[in-house]
């Protein structure tokens, strides 16, 4: 069972175990959650509503059990707090992320995908691509092609549209209030705004954007404002790095850092050597090479954590694996700490304030062990090292497809709940 991101996004705050009366009023409860704006350097909450803070006074913050922040679990005492029904979503672009967003949405009780637009894929091929997936396995539900413009997924109809120009997609007529822009094409405010012409209320870009407000669930989604009609869910790598950097910076301070992501192959790469005028190395065969590449993921952390702006940068290695990537963050700390101290802080956050967003493992894992992991970032305690009290290398895994797609839906529902409280 899934639950609203008002609850899921509480991963960015240390919140006491939910009481039945805490969620009695959507508007007032939402303002309570928004009133807590992060942690102090020791990972304790910096601001809380009086009701929550009083529950913390009787014990150390490390013993507090927070609201879970996964897309698949819900505390029994928590009720859905949106205004009415499910949040209706449309998807533009039925690639890797578009398909997984639809897959995951079918297992949630807070979101319903009502339409998919892709000018290059007809309804029959959409059904085939949704049913079979070489990485994540076969779709467990039912898929039927009703006609050229309708799919039936788990007994619910999904409209199929084939428009090249997003301004021509009748989102309002299709019942979609929120649109996932996952084509990889319309990633700026001006381009993504075309969806608003068709009646969409909000657009979520499933990629970094040059000018749209950027959010990472568990890090800065609490800064979202209801007048923001177009937002970016950042990149999968930023979603992995930002929660890790948040914890380390708030506990020890990050003076500067370099990030490397060892990234699985993506659809933009070539199966064999081919032309790539902007990135010559990027045109080399994906299955034959480890390919150095640029990435703005580390710099983008400065957009979601302004206190780290200008302190992080990084690069990528594209490697011949189909899924799951790993971030290597090497950084200088402001406050002296052993590697064991850093591990302890991350473990605490993974079990408390960032549970379901940031994970922790001390087992001897490899990349394939994280296929289908819904968390944004899973810290590998055995893979990192410390050189001194102020210089550490931190390693964190992420399913760059599945985890990211979960966060897209989490961000949508958070936006819907903000709208419901205003």
UniProtKB/Swiss-Prot annotation:
Gene3D superfamilies referenced in this protein's UniProt entry, alphabetically: Dihydrodipicolinate Reductase, domain 2 (3.30.360.10), NAD(P)-binding Rossmann-like Domain (3.40.50.720)
InterPro entries in UniProt: GlycerAld/Erythrose_P_DH (IPR020831), GlycerAld_3-P_DH_AS (IPR020830), GlycerAld_3-P_DH_cat (IPR020829), GlycerAld_3-P_DH_NAD(P)-bd (IPR020828), Glyceraldehyde-3-P_DH_1 (IPR006424), NAD(P)-bd_dom_sf (IPR036291)
Superkingdom in the source lineage: Eukaryota
Subcellular location: Plastid, Chloroplast stroma
UniProt subunit comment: Homotetramer.
Site (Activates thiol group during catalysis): 263
Summary of the tissues where the protein is detected: Expressed in shoot and root vasculature, leaf veins and vascular tissue of flowers and siliques.
Residue span of region Disordered: 50-84
Keyword Cell membrane attributed: no
Organism: Arabidopsis thaliana
Keyword vocabulary terms for this entry: Acetylation, Chloroplast, Glycolysis, NAD, Oxidoreductase, Plastid, Transit peptide
EC nos: 1.2.1.12
Molecular function terms, GO-annotated: copper ion binding; glyceraldehyde-3-phosphate dehydrogenase (NAD+) (phosphorylating) activity; NAD binding; NADP binding; zinc ion binding
Function description: Involved in plastidial glycolytic pathway and plays a specific role in glycolytic energy production in non-green plastids and chloroplasts. Essential for breakdown of starch to form sucrose for export to non-photosynthetic tissues, and to generate primary metabolites for anabolic pathways such as fatty acid and amino acid synthesis. Plays an important role in plant development by providing substrates for the phosphorylated pathway of serine biosynthesis in roots. Plays a crucial role in pollen development. Functionally redundant with GAPCP2.
Record's protein name: Glyceraldehyde-3-phosphate dehydrogenase GAPCP1, chloroplastic
Induction context: Repressed by darkness, but not by sucrose.
A Gene Ontology BP annotation from the UniProt entry: pollen development
A Pfam cross-reference name: Gp_dh_N
